[in-house]
Amino acid sequence: MKESQSLQEKYAPNNTCWGCGPANPDGLHTRSFPKNGEVVAEWKPERKYEAFEGVLNGGVIGTLLDCHCNWTAAYHLMKHANEDHPPCTVTAEYEIKLLRPTPTNDSVFLSARVVDLTDDRATVEGTLTAGGKVCATCRGVFVAVKEGHPAYHRW
């Protein structure tokens, strides 16, 4: 992807989340970009994230999809409210389906879209694709937190 600044870098440059925080030196650094009504990302696996040789660990897959879908929700909640900055959102519920082994020899691609939206929550469906095949899908509910919640100021 050629986009210069991801949602994470633009709106939460000091975020230390292991999955998507730009400020976490040991993190996965998921970089999500709005595109044609969806949010997309490309991520290159490293061997240290393998479950076994050549196959990405399922927990890492879950983290990638969770963070990417969370940012999809935050972005769309921001647009829905006509705000300049996304609300801090957290995962309220989340389901992932691992459909096939995810190879680590090339980039994986994430895509997510909102399927239901209210003022403070979004239901998001996402996919992780590798080698031209969908390897995992997810569906989650992500909620904008209110002041007083531990995650309120994380962005």
Language model features with spans:
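Conserved beta-strand residues within beta-sheet cores
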Residues: 26-29, 42, 91-95, 109-111, ...
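Active-site helix/loop of acyl-thioester processing domains in fatty-acid/polyketide metabolism
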Residues: 36-38, 56-84
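Short histidine-centered beta-strand/loop micro-motifs
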Residues: 52-55, 106
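HotDog/MaoC-like acyl-thioester-processing domains
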Residues: 1-8, 102-109, 113-155
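Non-catalytic linker/capping segments at the edges of enzyme domains
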Residues: 1-51
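Hydrophobic residues in beta-strands and at strand termini
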Residues: 43-45, 98, 144
